[in-house]
Structure formats: structure tokens, C-alpha cells
Amino acid sequence: MFKFNDEKGQLKCSFCGKTQDQVRKLVAGPGVYICDECIELCTEIVEEELGNEEEFEFKDVPKPLEIREILDEYVIGQDEAKKSLAVAVYNHYKRINSGSKIDDVELSKSNILMIGPTGSGKTLLAQTLARILNVPFAIADATSLTEAGYVGEDVENILLKLIQAADYDVERAEKGIIYIDEIDKIARKSENPSITRDVSGEGVQQALLKILEGTIASVPPQGGRKHPHQEFIQIDTTNILFICGGAFDGIEPIIKRRLGKKVIGFGAEMNQTDVDEKNLLSKVLPEDLLKFGLIPEFIGRLPVITTLEPLDEQALIDILTKPKNAIVKQYQKMLELDGVELEFEEAALREIAKKAIERKTGARGLRSIIEGIMLDVMFELPSREDVQKCIITLDTVRGTKPPTLIRHDGTVIELERKTSA
């Protein structure tokens, strides 16, 4: 039992144990004492908790137009996708503010499915939305998930990532955003229900249904598999926004067949070459996703479907140079800190974009290409005080010549050529 005084008979704080001589004030209660320092600490904790609650009431959710304007600062192109996402996100958090029901009208969740090729900006759009709204954000890879009881991750581990992103504040996590990538990889192998167990396909879709719709999920705090003798974190997924993304390679022929089979007369079919193949993805319908291998219930949990276009050469050049976090701007800023001006020639940027298209990596491949080009520059220039300007040329990108370096007096020098052993 805690003693309220020490050997000398002095009163002590019941919380920190300091005597009345060690603190400025000791407040007495029924059989308990608390010092001014503990009162101050408790006040700070309570204010912090209340502050978090106010922050997550979402009274000032940005309007769809404002959301798209901020997305424009970080993501190039994809205007239709931005518009769809802005409206869906605005409606989702408006629904949270209203308490899901308005005059007996129940507002359903607006989870989102993004379809687009690798490197088209799906993950970046989801990350930027979370940053705009200042909510916890987690990314999960659908390919690592398996049905409960099999080797792999349980779907509840997705929720654990969100809880960790919210510093284990479950209330904050319950209003966060989860992006599930590679969702097309959990399509079942055929359109027909499988007799055999499909633990990483249809089984995962079934497991995801409840958390997408809204349920009280039990999450193991350390991750991994559940077992009966461990504690769980309870989290309500009703107000978590789920954004699923995937390339859906192979869905174009399904869309093309549907569009080409418009019956004329007594069952004659249109020539399938009449179908415009350029923007097939934008014409996707739930029935195409069903044929691809998503189960009807899973498609129903993702009411907002938006598509992203493949990035062309000019879009990739814009991605390199225009956004706030453009990689060229980042390298220019880093070299500026060393007193060096960095310049990319237009032809060099165009060649970098062409390489990314050839590799079929989209915007994702731009960073690795630039980092390969800039490695020697970033290694050597900080040690050279005679360089004022560094120019990346077409030949630099092609690997035939090193970057052009210019001294403070205007004379041109070159980095030493590397010779292979």
C-alpha cells in the first residue's frame, strides 16, 4: 500500500513520490495527494488528447476543387482520376461528419478502385490525398496476403500498418486511408467459382470484404498470425477509406470483346476492329472486372472506379521538372547547397523519358535512371570548389560522355572517364 508520508512524517505526492518540500504545492484529496508538477503533466496529456479529437472532426474538409488543385501540385496529368478521387474523398469525410445518416438516409462508403499501368501515379495520388487531409496512411501489397490459416499475411495486418502510422492512436487510425496495391493479383484464376482452395486469390477477396464494408476487427498488436492466448487491438473500419489499385494487365481484351459484341439484326456482330483501342481502360465496367476474376461482392465494395492513362513522353518530362517534389528540382537544390548550379538540357530530359517508356516503368523508373546518371556527379562535386555549373547533356544520359562542368571563370572541364578493369 502506498504511504502518504515518509519516515520524517512529510506528506508525499501519491503519483511521483516527491515530498512536500520538493514541490511548490501539494493538493489533498480523499486519501490521496497530488503535486503541482503532476497536475501540470496531467493537464498537458488531457489537452493533447482533446486536441487530437478536434483535429479529427474534419470540420474543414477541403472542397473537391481545392483537393484537385493540391493534387495538381504533385501529380502531373490524370485529370479525370483526380476529379473522381477528389469527389469520392470529399463525400467520404462529409459522410463521417454527418454520422453516416441524414434524415434516415444511410450514406454508404465510397471506397475507390484505381486501374492504371505501372508508374502512372496510383500510389502517389493516394499518398497525396492522405497528406492533404492530414490523416494516417498505410500502404499494403495484396500479393503478400493469404486466407487465414495459410502461410502469408492475414488481412488484419493491413490494419496494423495503419494503427502504427497513427502512433497506435486507434481513434485516429479509424479515420485514415489504406492503399492496397496490386489488387489485380488476387483475382481468381477463372470467372467461375473455384472448387479447389484459392488461398491467395478468391480467399483473400472474401477475407477483405468485411473490413472494406465496415466491421470491428481484432488486430494482433505485434502482427503475424492470430492465436487464442494473445491480446488484440479492436478497430472499427467503418470510416476507413480504402483505395485499391492495380494494373489489371489483360483486362483490355475483355473490354474489347464486350464493346465489339454489340448485336446488329439477327445476331450478327460488329467487326471487333471497329473498337477504339486507345482508351479501352476508361470504358471498364464492373462486368469486365467480374470476368477478370474479381468476385461480385468485392466489386460491390468498391463503388468508385477510376482509370489512369499511360504516361507519354511529355508527361514524363513534366513529372521530372514541374511538381513541388520533382526529382530534377530536388537534385538542383542539393547541388545548390554545395554552391553548384545544375542544368538538364531539354534533349537529356527527353532521352530520360524515352528510357522510362522503353523499360515500361512509367514515372517510377525516372528516379532510378536519374540516380544512375547523377551518382558520379554527387560523389565528386562536393569535393571540388572550382565548379560553378554542371550540365547534363544528351550524351551524358546515353552514357557516352560525362556531364559538362564549368568553372567560376567560365572555362569548361569534364569529369574523368571511368575505365573498367
Curated annotation (Swiss-Prot):
<dbReference type="InterPro" id="IPR027417">
    <property type="entry name" value="P-loop_NTPase"/>
</dbReference>
<dbReference type="GO" id="GO:0051301">
    <property type="term" value="P:cell division"/>
</dbReference>
<dbReference type="GO" id="GO:0016887">
    <property type="term" value="F:ATP hydrolysis activity"/>
</dbReference>
<dbReference type="GO" id="GO:0009376">
    <property type="term" value="C:HslUV protease complex"/>
</dbReference>
<comment type="function">
    <text>ATP-dependent specificity component of the Clp protease. It directs the protease to specific substrates. Can perform chaperone functions in the absence of ClpP.</text>
</comment>
<keyword id="KW-0862">Zinc</keyword>
<dbReference type="InterPro" id="IPR004487">
    <property type="entry name" value="Clp_protease_ATP-bd_su_ClpX"/>
</dbReference>
<dbReference type="InterPro" id="IPR038366">
    <property type="entry name" value="Znf_CppX_C4_sf"/>
</dbReference>
<dbReference type="Pfam" id="PF07724">
    <property type="entry name" value="AAA_2"/>
</dbReference>
<dbReference type="GO" id="GO:0008270">
    <property type="term" value="F:zinc ion binding"/>
</dbReference>
<dbReference type="GO" id="GO:0051603">
    <property type="term" value="P:proteolysis involved in protein catabolic process"/>
</dbReference>
<comment type="subunit">
    <text>Component of the ClpX-ClpP complex. Forms a hexameric ring that, in the presence of ATP, binds to fourteen ClpP subunits assembled into a disk-like structure with a central cavity, resembling the structure of eukaryotic proteasomes.</text>
</comment>
<dbReference type="InterPro" id="IPR003593">
    <property type="entry name" value="AAA+_ATPase"/>
</dbReference>
<feature type="domain" description="ClpX-type ZB">
    <location>
        <begin position="1"/>
        <end position="54"/>
    </location>
</feature>
<feature type="binding site">
    <location>
        <begin position="117"/>
        <end position="124"/>
    </location>
    <ligand>
        <name>ATP</name>
    </ligand>
</feature>
<protein>
    <recommendedName>
        <fullName>ATP-dependent Clp protease ATP-binding subunit ClpX</fullName>
    </recommendedName>
</protein>
<keyword id="KW-0143">Chaperone</keyword>
<feature type="binding site">
    <location>
        <position position="35"/>
    </location>
    <ligand>
        <name>Zn(2+)</name>
    </ligand>
</feature>
<dbReference type="InterPro" id="IPR019489">
    <property type="entry name" value="Clp_ATPase_C"/>
</dbReference>
<dbReference type="GO" id="GO:0140662">
    <property type="term" value="F:ATP-dependent protein folding chaperone"/>
</dbReference>
<feature type="binding site">
    <location>
        <position position="38"/>
    </location>
    <ligand>
        <name>Zn(2+)</name>
    </ligand>
</feature>
<keyword id="KW-0479">Metal-binding</keyword>
<feature type="binding site">
    <location>
        <position position="13"/>
    </location>
    <ligand>
        <name>Zn(2+)</name>
    </ligand>
</feature>
<dbReference type="Pfam" id="PF06689">
    <property type="entry name" value="zf-C4_ClpX"/>
</dbReference>
<comment type="similarity">
    <text>Belongs to the ClpX chaperone family.</text>
</comment>
<dbReference type="InterPro" id="IPR010603">
    <property type="entry name" value="Znf_CppX_C4"/>
</dbReference>
<feature type="binding site">
    <location>
        <position position="16"/>
    </location>
    <ligand>
        <name>Zn(2+)</name>
    </ligand>
</feature>
<dbReference type="GO" id="GO:0005524">
    <property type="term" value="F:ATP binding"/>
</dbReference>
<dbReference type="GO" id="GO:0051082">
    <property type="term" value="F:unfolded protein binding"/>
</dbReference>
<dbReference type="GO" id="GO:0046983">
    <property type="term" value="F:protein dimerization activity"/>
</dbReference>
<keyword id="KW-0067">ATP-binding</keyword>
<dbReference type="InterPro" id="IPR046425">
    <property type="entry name" value="ClpX_bact"/>
</dbReference>
<dbReference type="InterPro" id="IPR050052">
    <property type="entry name" value="ATP-dep_Clp_protease_ClpX"/>
</dbReference>
<keyword id="KW-0547">Nucleotide-binding</keyword>
<dbReference type="Pfam" id="PF10431">
    <property type="entry name" value="ClpB_D2-small"/>
</dbReference>
<dbReference type="InterPro" id="IPR003959">
    <property type="entry name" value="ATPase_AAA_core"/>
</dbReference>
